[in-house]
């Protein structure tokens, strides 16, 4: 399976993918963690930024031109089963990733918090669900949550792992998360 990191330019925090976290750009740190984990065949950075560069992942240009649902559909079409990661969540817990890979049985799988929040950009999207993804989008679906709720499997995780899903949206998040 391929790890696919979805990257787009941030309107709220321009240049955030390059913000240094532990000496690496935000996205580059995530790519290094995933590529070094030994859990994936390949780490792909699926970016709308044609100038993005990485030492830890292969850059593939996302020219879907739409919302994240369109990007996920394009990635599943190109790569088959994918483990989708957000480019702005630096606290990936490899034990959660590993547990999800072990539980994956060919059906889209998404972690769910104790307060019922789905983490759709820390989710496995299955090739066998591609037709359902396309139908969902074709029928006006826009939310990845809606797709997973209707077509996926949810996997609960513990409160101690909530940090895994903290993301950086604003410069103030760097302070809040002690980065």
Where are these regions (language model features)?
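N-terminal glycine-rich phosphate-binding loop and ensuing alpha1 helix
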Residues: 1-49, 98
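A short acidic, helix-capping loop that chelates divalent metal ions and anchors anionic groups
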Residues: 12-17, 118-119, 132, 164
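Active-site acidic Asp-centered loop
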Residues: 47-48, 85-87
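Short phosphate-binding loop-to-helix
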Residues: 53-85, 91-99
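Conserved donor-nucleotide/metal-binding helix-loop-beta segment in metal-dependent transferases, i.e.
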Residues: 93-117
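Conserved nucleotide-sugar donor-binding
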Residues: 119-132, 171
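Aromatic-glycine-rich donor-binding/catalytic loop that engages nucleotide-sugar donors
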Residues: 127-138, 177-179
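Conserved alpha/beta core of the MobA/IspD/sugar-nucleotide pyrophosphorylase nucleotidyltransferase superfamily
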Residues: 140-179
């Amino acid at each position: 399976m391929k790890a696919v990191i979805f990257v787009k330019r941030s309107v709220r925090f321009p240049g955030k993918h390059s913000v240094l976290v532990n000496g690496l750009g935000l996205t580059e740190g995530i790519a290094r963690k995933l590529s070094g984990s030994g859990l994936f065949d390949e780490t792909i950075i699926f970016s709308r930024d044609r100038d993005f560069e990485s030492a830890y992942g292969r850059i593939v240009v996302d020219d879907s031109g739409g919302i994240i649902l369109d990007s996920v559909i394009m990635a599943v079409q190109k790569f088959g089963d994918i483990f989708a990661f957000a480019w702005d969540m630096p606290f990936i817990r490899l034990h959660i990733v590993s547990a999800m890979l072990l539980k994956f049985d060919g059906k889209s799988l998404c972690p769910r918090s104790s307060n019922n929040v789905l983490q759709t950009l820390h989710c496995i999207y299955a090739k066998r669900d591609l037709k359902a993804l396309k139908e969902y989008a074709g029928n006006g679906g826009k939310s990845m949550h809606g797709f997973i709720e209707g077509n996926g499997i949810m996997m609960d995780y513990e409160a101690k792992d909530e940090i895994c899903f903290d993301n950086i949206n604003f410069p103030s998040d760097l302070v809040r998360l002690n980065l």
